[in-house]
């Protein structure tokens, strides 16, 4: 039978909603009772899908004073419109303040009276009212220097105020430029181009049940020293009866073996082996459908352009973990390079041979593992690819040199989905 005549027993799950409608059914190894298990109501997320923490601070003592004491961090953290409004008000307040001071000096010196009445040299030339004093304040702080108004040696106080306003203007400018540059250079936005899969999966990997999720980098610039970590968050009651609403338990992603450090050039599947030390060791597929927990995944590294540390976060609720699924391949070899097809990044396919028991029961040999030579989705892709390559080679051999060149030309423009792919493990 040819590759095109084979039936594909693996169903593709392309969205989060499809994964939530999966039912437990009897697999090839006899696990499962065929009943539909209803999930409990979804708990509130501690970390949202976009990485934001779902928390709100309340009843904080001296919140305003504490935020004002760290004014620079406050200006960097607030929204752009508020930061620009603050600096605009700061400039306007300084201009008004020194404008009022110069106006008071002029009033005290009698500069607002006609020059013929007193015959003295004014403290500030061409200042005959508050508006003129305000314009002189703006010219002094911004160093515009139109030339109509200037300070004379008649009033040392006016000279001192010009020096003071120049210093205040430099301080405001430096603070504003520093805050804007720090806000623009923050690595927070770099996390927007770091991608996590919509779902996590549980499947066999080298004979062991593993929790897996996928991460990817949408930019060609690298994340230096990239490493991942994960935590399981769920409510817990201690032996003394204390209720902990968000108990955090570390999930090992290969720290001892160095597997937590990744070279994030192409999408990588992060793996957590469900062993005796795993908090998921006693959870089966049926338990997963009714359990209440959240897995927070974190990707950290340095931005290549700025060497600043960035952090991307996401989370998976229990109903977002697909038992008995694997991720579709996204990395394919094409001519002299590798191509990444992000249209398959979030897609998974079901593997019915995955045991439905917990890893604990699997270790205790209560259930038999399926054959390691069982047919899988990647194998089918590889067979289809080889069959198509053989057909193409056969057609090319039957053509002449000129016809062979004509045959190769449209193949270079074939869409990515139509080109022969190799299995992910062969690349």
UniProtKB/Swiss-Prot annotation:
Extracellular topological domain: 105-129, 147-155
Disulfide bridge partners, by residue number: 123-155
Cytoplasmic side: 1-77, 184-427
Residues where S-nitrosocysteine is found: 75
Positions annotated to bind K(+) 3: 144-145
One Pfam family per UniProt: IRK_N
Membrane-crossing residue ranges in chain numbering: 78-104, 156-183
Region (Disordered), start-end ranges: 387-427
Motif interval(s): Selectivity filter: 143-148
GO cellular component term, pick one: membrane
Intramembrane intervals: 130-146
Gene Ontology BP term (one): regulation of monoatomic ion transmembrane transport
Motif segment (PDZ-binding): 425-427
Subcellular location: Membrane
Annotated GO MF terms: inward rectifier potassium channel activity; metal ion binding
Binding-site list for K(+) 1: 143
This protein's UniProt keywords: Disulfide bond, Ion channel, Ion transport, Membrane, Metal-binding, Potassium, Potassium transport, S-nitrosylation, Transmembrane, Transmembrane helix, Transport, Voltage-gated channel
Chain positions recorded as K(+) 4 binding sites: 145-146
Binding positions for K(+) 2 per the UniProt entry: 143-144
Residues bound to a 1,2-diacyl-sn-glycero-3-phospho-(1D-myo-inositol-4,5-bisphosphate): 79, 81, 183, 188
Function: Inward rectifying potassium channel that probably participates in controlling the resting membrane potential in electrically excitable cells. Probably participates in establishing action potential waveform and excitability of neuronal and muscle tissues. Inward rectifier potassium channels are characterized by a greater tendency to allow potassium to flow into the cell rather than out of it. Their voltage dependence is regulated by the concentration of extracellular potassium; as external potassium is raised, the voltage range of the channel opening shifts to more positive voltages.
Family of this protein: Belongs to the inward rectifier-type potassium channel (TC 1.A.2.1) family. KCNJ12 subfamily.
Complex and partners: Homotetramer. Forms heteromer with KCNJ4. Association, via its PDZ-recognition domain, with LIN7A, LIN7B, LIN7C, DLG1, CASK and APBA1 plays a key role in its localization and trafficking.
Name of the protein in question: ATP-sensitive inward rectifier potassium channel 12
Classification of source organism: Eukaryota, Metazoa, Chordata, Craniata, Vertebrata
Name of the gene encoding the protein in the UniProt record: KCNJ12
